[in-house]
């Protein structure tokens, strides 16, 4: 059985609102060198290790401009305008339970990729149960979004025992999502 997803205007509007915050940012996909650590041995067979990162915001997009765009979107949606930026562009999509938050932020990732070339996303959730639900949502929406955008997201659950996943996250130019529960940040050793 294949699930059918309807296009909901409020979900598209939420994704567009996030994309609009960064209007003026050019579409770029820069590369950078992956730091292989201090134990590297140089040989004539060593590869050049290239990784991918989201392009930094251009200097013309100042914090004041970003804040004013956020306020404009908030006013248009009858939301009390923010007094200041929270963190460095900490944007939140708030919706009622069961209306498609996960769908909306997956759509937002595709739209940010389409508009600006951004391809690295980290989803931090408060619990293992929610992490598993988010992972399942990525699985069941994969084909739907692939049909709409012509590409698939590579997603994975962070596990400190599988560091090759993080290496792939950094070295793959496609859209990549790491799903992690907040407890994993503080975990040590095998608990991470």
PLM features per residue range, with description:
Residues 1-192:
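RecA-like P-loop NTPase motor core of helicase/translocase proteins
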């Amino acid at each position: 059985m294949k699930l059918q997803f309807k296009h909901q205007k409020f979900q598209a509007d939420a994704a567009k609102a996030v994309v609009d915050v960064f209007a003026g940012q050019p579409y770029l996909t820069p590369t950078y060198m992956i730091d292989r650590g201090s134990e590297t041995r140089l040989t004539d067979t060593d590869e050049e290790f290239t990784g991918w990162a989201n392009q930094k915001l251009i200097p013309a997009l100042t914090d004041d401009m970003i804040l004013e765009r956020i306020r404009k979107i908030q006013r248009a949606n009858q939301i009390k305008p923010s007094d200041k930026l929270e963190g460095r562009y900490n944007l939140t999509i708030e919706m009622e339970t069961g209306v498609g938050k996960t769908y909306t932020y997956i759509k937002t990732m595709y739209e940010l990729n389409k508009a600006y070339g951004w391809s690295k996303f980290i989803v931090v959730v408060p619990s293992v149960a929610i992490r598993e639900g988010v992972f399942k949502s990525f699985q069941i929406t994969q084909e739907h979004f692939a049909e709409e955008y012509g590409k698939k997201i590579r997603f994975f659950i962070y596990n400190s025992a599988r560091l090759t996943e993080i290496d792939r996250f950094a070295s793959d130019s496609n859209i990549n999502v790491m799903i992690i529960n907040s407890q994993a940040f503080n975990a040590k050793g095998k608990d991470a």
